[in-house]
Design a protein with these regions (language model features):
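Active-site helix-to-loop segments that bind/position phosphate- or nucleotide-bearing substrates
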Residues: 13, 27-243
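Divalent-cation
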Residues: 1-23, 30, 118
C-alpha cells in the first residue's frame, strides 16, 4: 500500500475558507479561531510568545508522564468532544506545541516544561517558576504561620494550593426563601481561575516568585511582571489584549 506524506512549512500567514471562516487544527478536529485568538497571532509578530520558546537544554526525558495523563484527563472533562486526549502522548504534546523540533531533535518549550515537566527538570531549567504560599491567622496578620514552597508543574501547583486554601475555607449557611444555600469563604473555581491567570500571565524572565497569601477574610495573589509596551494605567481597559504567554 502506497502512502504519500506531504509536509508543508508554516509561512506565518493566516488563511480563511471561501466562506470567510478561520479554522485551527486541534488533534483530528478543525475548530474555529475566534477574534481574540487571531489578535494574539497578530500581536505575536511584535511580541514573540515567551512560553513558546524551545528550551535548548531539555530532552523528552524531562517529561513527567503522570502530568501528561493528568492534563489529558482535565481536557477530557473540559471538552468531552475533543479528540486530543485520544492521541498518544507525543502527538498530544506536539499538537499543543508543548514540544517542538529543534533541528532534528524534539525538545520541550517553556509551556511544555511548565505543564508536563518533571519537578527536578523545572528546578534545573526554570528555577524561577516558583509559587510560595503563606498563611496568616487572625491573631497575627503581619507574620505568616504556615508556608509552602512549590516548584511543580502548573496543574500540580493548582491542585495542591486549592487543597490548602480549601482546608482553611469555612462555609456559611444562608437562608434564601425556602432554600438554604452554602456560601464558601473562597469558592474553589474562583480561586483556581485567579491562580491560573496569575501563573499564565506572569513574567517568567523575572527571578521573582508568585505569592499566594491567605488571610482569614481574603486571598491575595501577587505575580511578577509589569505592563507590556504600549499599555499604561490609563489605557489598560481599552487597549487591545497583548498576552505575555499564550
Amino acid at each position: 500500500k502506497l502512502v504519500i506524506a506531504i509536509s508543508v512549512k508554516a509561512d506565518g500567514k493566516t488563511y480563511t475558507t471561501t466562506e470567510g471562516r478561520c479554522l485551527k487544527r486541534l488533534g483530528r478536529n478543525s475548530k474555529p479561531a475566534y477574534p481574540d485568538e487571531l489578535s494574539n497571532v497578530y500581536s505575536s509578530v511584535q511580541n514573540p510568545d515567551f512560553s513558546g520558546r524551545i528550551i535548548g537544554e531539555s530532552t523528552l526525558d524531562d517529561i513527567n508522564k503522570l502530568e501528561v495523563y493528568s492534563l489529558k484527563e482535565k481536557l477530557r472533562v473540559r471538552d468531552s468532544k475533543s479528540t486530543l486526549p485520544d492521541l498518544d502522548d507525543i502527538d498530544f504534546l506536539r499538537d499543543l506545541q508543548l514540544i517542538k523540533y529543534d533541528g532534528d531533535v524534539e525538545r520541550l518549550t517553556i509551556a511544555g516544561l511548565l505543564f508536563v515537566g518533571k519537578e527536578t527538570s523545572i528546578q534545573r531549567l526554570l528555577p524561577q517558576a516558583e509559587v510560595i504560599y503563606l498563611h496568616y491567622s487572625a491573631d497575627n496578620l503581619e507574620e505568616y504561620d504556615a508556608r509552602l514552597d512549590l516548584k511543580l508543574p502548573l496543574i500540580s501547583v493548582i491542585d495542591k494550593l486549592t487543597e490548602r486554601v480549601q482546608a482553611y475555607s469555612k462555609i456559611e449557611n444562608i437562608q434564601v426563601g425556602l432554600f438554604r444555600l452554602e456560601v464558601e469563604d473562597f469558592p474553589e473555581r474562583v480561586f483556581q481561575e485567579a491562580l491560573l491567570n496569575a501563573l499564565s500571565h506572569r513574567d517568567y524572565q523575572s527571578n521573582a516568585a508568585v505569592y499566594v497569601k491567605q488571610y482569614p477574610d481574603r486571598v491575595v495573589i501577587e505575580n511578577p511582571g509589569g505592563f507590556l509596551e504600549g499599555i499604561t494605567e490609563d489605557n489598560i481597559i481599552t487597549h487591545p489584549s497583548i498576552p505575555r504567554n499564550k
